[in-house]
């Protein structure tokens, strides 16, 4: 055993025991998440990101984030028909403290899907890959269920295989016609009231009566090259700070968005 001083105990324990604990939230900033102007509620929420330090830029950490929001929140509506639809918004650019988002997909909640599946009926599904006029490649999923005819005395309402094929063909044709003739903004406007599903239900009445027909899911498979002008056009009609910036620029000056309690940095030389 070596005889000598224990340097660790003489200095008062382990190194770094009195290290100052820094709250990680002091290095972060809050940013407002903005939805495109297809929706009534433009202010979706807030998101955190580390402040810009050296080569790590805050806006790079925000781009590509996906936010999932209920349609009821986006439309400021308490209607039950809107609450089970979830829209995905992806952050594409950052302007000041605003994160500008674009449509990234749509889905139904799990509880809604599970509640529709019942006995004594036929479930009919289809999926189509379609391209919009502005070169977005979407995969659209549709779901529907057969319903018992009022005149029928049967307990069940199963469709024949030929009827299922005819219904699926109608679904594919209507989805293709609606999406290929529209750009992404028009497609989203059709998804809000689910007008495509209503057209399918009406068209299939002659084959076999359907109910609970919905566009179950929409995936964005491919996007065109990022265009800032198109994104700003999607966010152009909103009020608030965005409108202030545009009016200020029109008058010859620019309104700069600053956080609360902002103080300009001290200049070393003038």
From Swiss-Prot:
GO term, biological process aspect, one: translation
One GO MF term attached to the UniProt entry: structural constituent of ribosome
Chief place of localization: cytoplasm
Pfam families, A to Z: Ribosomal_S3Ae (PF01015)
Keywords: Cytoplasm, Ribonucleoprotein, Ribosomal protein
GO CC terms, sorted: cytosolic small ribosomal subunit
Places the protein is found: Cytoplasm
InterPro entries with a match to the protein in the record: Ribosomal_eS1, Ribosomal_eS1_CS, Ribosomal_eS1_euk
Chain segments annotated as transmembrane: none
Region Disordered: start-end pairs: 1-20, 238-270
Complexes and interactors: Component of the small ribosomal subunit. Mature ribosomes consist of a small (40S) and a large (60S) subunit. The 40S subunit contains about 33 different proteins and 1 molecule of RNA (18S). The 60S subunit contains about 49 different proteins and 3 molecules of RNA (28S, 5.8S and 5S).
Protein family (similarity comment): Belongs to the eukaryotic ribosomal protein eS1 family.
Stated name of the protein: Small ribosomal subunit protein eS1
Annotated source species: Culex quinquefasciatus (Southern house mosquito)
